[in-house]
Structure formats: C-alpha cells, structure tokens
C-alpha cells in the first residue's frame, strides 16, 4: 500500500480563501494525500463538523498601522503565530504546503520558507493580495485563476501557472441530466463572502427583469 503524501493547506478567514482550500483538500484526498488545513477563528466557522478534525486554528492578524499600540499588538501576534508555525512544522513536516491567500496563511508560509519546506500560493483574484505579494519571492509557484494577474513584477512570471478557479468536483462533473432543454434559463452563481452586495442588490434586479420578460430561470 502506497504511503500517503502529507500536504498542508493554509487558508485565510474569508470564504474566498476557505472554499478553494476545501475544494483543493477534497481533490488531494482523492489522490491519496494526507491533508491538514490551518486557518484562523474566522475561517474555522466555514467548516462542517465532520471536517473539523483535520482543521487547526492558529491566531492571526493583519498588520494594523492605525496607532502604535495596535501596530505593536498586531506585530506581536504575527510573530507569535510564525513561532507557533515553526514549532508545528518542525514536528509535523509536510511534503508540500499550499497558501490560499489571506493573512492567516502568511505565518505558516513564512515558517515554511525558514524551514525550507516547499510551498505554493494560490491567487483567485485579478489583483494579487497583500499576503501573497509578500510571499511570492519565497514561493515555488503561484497558481492563478486569471492569466493577467495584476500587482506582480514581471521577474516572477516564470512562477505563474494558470489553473482557473478551484471549484467543487460536483460542479466539474455537472450532470448532463440537468442540461435538458426545458425552455428555462439556468444561472450558476459563484462568489466569495465579500460579494454580498452583488448578491443582495444586483442579482435580484436581474432575476426580476428575467421574470418580467417571461423568462423562466433556475438558480444553481
């Protein structure tokens, strides 16, 4: 029996980072990887109870520059999280680490760089996030959803690999039975947690317009 490859996935605290991480973990597990996920308290709430046994919660914070007190506090928390990550990785060294973006992924990836553990970062936005931008010089590769990623130097182009959005296998294996023509418009809606305004204000107007035009719609 083949020995499982150990992989660690570090995800930020919003849905835009967590769900691609969950989808990546699902795919790696199917390929016989032993997967552990690290996130913060914000990200932890997105996981199902059955999945939480493989999820670790580390403290995290962005670098807050509003005043000296907050700067010192946030910097101390980041340094503590890096130290904790160093200790964890020293005793639980994975073969590969994936950083999915967000400041909660930063300490693990910095610790990986110090310990010379290979890590790959993933960016699903059009503009690279601050954490990923800081990590890019140390990363083996950066996986991107859009080929024309903004905010990175051309000297890192060789590290860029376009993979698209990491979505659920259920969407990839979309059943042909659901595509049978029934004179209805099927709309697939995808979005992160910060797309709430679009979901709440724009999409309802679009759906109402379809209804006014007599178009039957099905939202997936």
What function would you assign to each model-found segment?
Residues 25, 29, 113, 136, ...:
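Gly/Ala-rich phosphate-binding loop of Rossmann-like dinucleotide-binding domains
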Residues 38, 43-51, 175-220:
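Donor-nucleotide binding loops and adjacent catalytic segments primarily
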Residues 6-12, 29-74, 163:
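Conserved nucleotide-sugar phosphate-binding/catalytic loop shared by glycosyltransferases and other
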Residues 67-96, 114:
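An amphipathic, basic-hydrophobic alpha-helix
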Residues 42-46, 94-115:
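An aromatic- and histidine-rich active-site surface loop
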Residues 3, 34, 53-54, 113-174:
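Active-site-proximal region of nucleotide-activated glycan assembly enzymes
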Residues 9-22, 197:
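A short, glycine/small-residue-rich beta-strand->loop->alpha-helix junction that serves as a flexible
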């Amino acid at each position: 029996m083949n020995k499982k490859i150990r992989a660690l996935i570090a995800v930020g605290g919003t849905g835009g980072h967590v769900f691609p991480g969950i989808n990546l973990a699902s795919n790696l597990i199917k390929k016989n990887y032993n997967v552990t996920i690290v996130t913060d308290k914000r990200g932890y709430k997105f996981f199902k109870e059955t999945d939480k046994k493989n999820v670790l919660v580390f403290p995290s914070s962005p670098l807050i520059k509003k005043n000296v007190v907050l700067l010192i506090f946030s910097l101390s928390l980041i340094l503590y999280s890096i130290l904790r990550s160093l200790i964890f990785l020293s005793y639980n060294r994975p073969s590969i680490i994936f950083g999915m973006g967000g400041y909660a992924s930063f300490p693990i990836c910095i610790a990986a760089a110090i310990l010379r553990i290979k890590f790959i970062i993933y960016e699903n936005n059009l503009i690279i996030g601050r954490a990923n931008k800081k990590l890019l010089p140390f990363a083996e590769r950066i996986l991107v959803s859009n080929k024309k990623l903004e905010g990175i130097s051309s000297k890192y182009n060789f590290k860029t690999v376009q993979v698209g959005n990491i979505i659920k296998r259920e969407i990839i294996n979309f059943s042909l039975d659901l595509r049978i023509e029934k004179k209805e418009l099927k709309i697939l809606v995808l979005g992160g947690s910060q797309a709430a305004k679009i979901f709440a204000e724009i999409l309802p107007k679009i759906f109402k317009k379809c209804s006014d035009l007599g178009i039957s719609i099905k939202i997936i």
